[in-house]
Amino acid sequence: SDINEHIPTLIRYGQECEHITEMGVRGIYSTWAFLAAAPKKLISYDLEDPSNWGGNINDVYETAESYGLNFEFIKANVLEIEIEETDFLFLDTWHVYEQVRDELKLHSHKVKKYIGFHDIVSWGERGETEGYKGINYAIDEFLENNNEWQIKEKFLNNNGLLIIERIK
């Protein structure tokens, strides 16, 4: 998958969290990583059903249930919802400046520990849609304007992964 090399990192951060919010599910690869971290609650959002990408969300529900974990998949536009307070927010939706800027503006105040961003290399400078700026502009702008957040870890392999942490 386009994220497989980051699975151990996602599990590691997930293990420090009781509540994880994932935005952008696609084929549920990162969802499995977060479930493996065994948080008390995992909520995953996407505009489309994971079956469109070959993922079976029912498998996730069954696995979560068998381990006593609270999992919920919500089909929604993440710019039109209000999330629960969460320890880790993972963003992997539409990889353009405006989308990530708005996701951060809407949801970052609900995040207690970490925000993760996938595809900082593949869609960092140039957005995934022609004519749009990449996500790194939104991340840099957010960090510049919110000094309670700082970069924790950055990986350039497998499309790139960035973890920022709340420091106050």
Would you name each region that the model predicts?
Residues D2-K168:
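S-adenosylmethionine/decaboxylated-SAM
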